């Protein structure tokens, strides 16, 4: 559905397939098609599920080994409604995936996402994007000024 809305290709396997194999095929297809960007969505991973974190580590290794000259962004998607647990979650994801940025979701609700200050300070990674809705146009570049102003509204 999202790929159709965005007008992009999708590489997928049947349900239950090894996620790392899907990423391997996606990287190879992206290189063969001379793609500018390859997005690998590993949604649904919980930092306290060792097998899922091991898969994530394997995925990162596959990307780095098969596209060594590519610029790789590893973005952690955090829910703005998540509290203190988000700090621990971010640390654990960073240990296996070398996070380069954060996407903060659900800023359209009552959550202000103040925990992101602790996370960015702790990990020294920037917030790159925020979402303020569920449409593709609701993904916006992060503005520190707007974020701080919203915290104090």
Language model feature labels by segment:
Residues 1-73, 97, 110, 114, ...:
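Nucleotide-state-sensitive switch-loop elements of NTP-binding domains
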Residues 81-83, 108-110:
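Short Gly/Pro-enriched loop/turn and capping motifs at secondary-structure junctions
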Residues 83-84, 92-96:
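C-terminal structured domain segments across diverse proteins
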Residues 88-89, 114-116:
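Short beta-alpha junctions and helix-cap segments that line functional grooves
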Residues 100-101:
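Helical hairpin unit composed of two closely spaced alpha helices linked by a short loop
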Residues 105:
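Phosphate-centric recognition/catalysis
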């Amino acid at each position: 559905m999202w790929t159709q809305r965005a007008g992009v290709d999708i590489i997928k396997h049947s349900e239950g397939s090894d996620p790392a194999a899907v990423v391997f095929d996606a990287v190879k297809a992206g290189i063969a098609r001379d793609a500018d960007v390859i997005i690998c969505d590993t949604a649904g991973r919980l930092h306290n599920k060792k097998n899922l974190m091991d898969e994530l580590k394997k995925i990162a290794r596959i990307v780095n080994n098969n596209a060594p000259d590519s610029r790789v962004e590893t973005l952690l998607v955090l829910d703005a409604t998540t509290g203190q647990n988000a700090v621990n979650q971010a640390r654990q994801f960073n240990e296996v995936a070398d996070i380069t940025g954060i996407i903060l979701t659900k800023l359209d609700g009552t959550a202000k996402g103040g925990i992101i200050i602790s996370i960015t300070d702790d990990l020294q990674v920037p917030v790159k994007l925020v979402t303020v809705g569920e449409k593709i146009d609701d993904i916006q570049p992060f503005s520190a000024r707007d974020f701080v102003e919203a915290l104090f509204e």
